[in-house]
Regions:
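Structured, active/binding-site neighborhoods that engage oxygen-rich ligands
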Residues: 1-193
Length: 193
């Protein structure tokens, strides 16, 4: 039987790129590095186990890129997943949340393609941390693209870094792609707490 339910754009695009055969299997030469041209939260929701496995290895960045490219080949997705992974590594190593965010920010702004965008988005987060999560998310963006969802998740975590439940409830109350933002924030808080 063929699945006919909801598929996010990354999954749909990846399946199209795989050109699945009659048995719903990809061709033998498919390298699983041809994900969708998608810049949303798909990989963010499942990257934490990859980071936990490779955090202490020199190959972490390559593994994050490879894991991202399974479902998303968009350069923005790869850049933001590298930032997501670096934040997880900092938190898993015991760095306090605020220091971890600032350390990651320092490297993020050096990204050759997305550095200016990331610098702006980190600044946007810090400028809105005193607003309610609902107000901050409305300004930063409720939608799925990472340039909106990443800062919206981050501001909620910065506001209450030691309160898992409150943070996730405020993310849910802010609407939009709250499930994706909550998955990313939950990974950060899980690594932090």
């Amino acid at each position: 039987a063929e699945y006919s339910g909801y598929l996010d754009s990354a999954t749909r695009g990846t399946l199209e790129n795989a050109r699945l055969g009659i048995n719903h299997e990809p061709p033998q030469d498919f390298d699983f590095q041809s994900g969708a041209d998608d810049d949303q939260l798909a990989t963010a929701t499942s990257l934490a186990p990859v980071v936990a496995r490779y955090e202490a290895t020199p190959g972490l960045a390559e593994q994050v890129t490879r894991a991202t490219r399974v479902r998303q080949k968009h350069p923005r997705s790869i850049a933001y997943m590298q930032i997501h992974a670096r934040l997880l590594v900092e938190l898993l190593s015991g760095t306090d949340l605020h220091s971890a965010v600032h350390r990651v920010q320092e490297t993020a702004v050096q990204d050759p393609e997305f550095g200016p965008e990331l610098a702006l988005r980190f600044r946007d987060v810090f400028e809105r941390k005193h607003l309610s999560t609902i107000e901050a998310t409305a300004q930063l963006g409720q939608s799925c693209p990472l340039k909106n969802s990443f800062p919206s998740a981050l501001v909620a975590v910065i506001q209450t870094p030691d309160d898992f439940e409150s943070t996730l409830l405020r993310i849910v109350a802010a609407g939009g792609d709250n499930a994706g933002r909550a998955a990313m924030a939950g990974a950060w808080l899980g690594a932090h707490l």
